């Protein structure tokens, strides 16, 4: 399994009341993942993307898309797979910090460009 495949496994975090509660109390992170991803691929992808994090357990479930109406038109949302990733005790995935670092670096480079 190559790293290019692992970078395509995780699609993004799931932010909900349940995922926040699980993250705070049990150290479980919730991600949207590729529909064809296996539990082993999900574990390796999380450990690759978030360095220093050890995954102890992965639970997955397939979420069926809801049927939605817009007037007379009937549509359907896409199906997706969700993964509950349990981390080793005392560890946490810091997703918000990475975004702040990128924003800080962009701000500092724009300030130096203005000074020159």
Curated annotation (Swiss-Prot):
One of its GO terms (biological process) is translation. One of its GO terms (molecular function) is rRNA binding. InterPro entries: Nucleotide-bd_a/b_plait_sf, Ribosomal_uL23-like, Ribosomal_uL23/eL15/eS24_sf. Gene3D superfamilies: 3.30.70.330. Pfam families: Ribosomal_L23. GO terms for cellular component: ribonucleoprotein complex; ribosome. Keywords: Ribonucleoprotein, Ribosomal protein, RNA-binding, rRNA-binding. One of the early assembly proteins it binds 23S rRNA. One of the proteins that surrounds the polypeptide exit tunnel on the outside of the ribosome. Forms the main docking site for trigger factor binding to the ribosome. Belongs to the universal ribosomal protein uL23 family. PANTHER family: 60S RIBOSOMAL PROTEIN L23A. Part of the 50S ribosomal subunit. Contacts protein L29, and trigger factor when it is bound to the ribosome. This is Large ribosomal subunit protein uL23. It comes from Psychrobacter sp. (strain PRwf-1).
């Amino acid at each position: 399994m190559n790293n290019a495949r692992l970078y395509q496994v995780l699609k993004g975090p799931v932010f909900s009341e349940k995922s926040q509660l699980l993250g705070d109390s049990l150290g479980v992170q919730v991600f949207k993942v590729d529909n064809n991803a296996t539990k082993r691929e999900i574990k390796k992808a999380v450990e690759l993307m978030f360095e220093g994090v050890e995954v102890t357990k992965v639970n997955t479930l397939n979420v069926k898309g809801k049927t939605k109406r817009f007037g007379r038109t009937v549509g359907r949302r896409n199906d997706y797979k969700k993964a509950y990733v349990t981390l080793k005790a005392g560890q946490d995935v810091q997703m918000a910090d990475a975004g702040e670092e990128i924003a800080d670096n962009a701000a500092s480079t724009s300030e130096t460009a203005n000074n020159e």
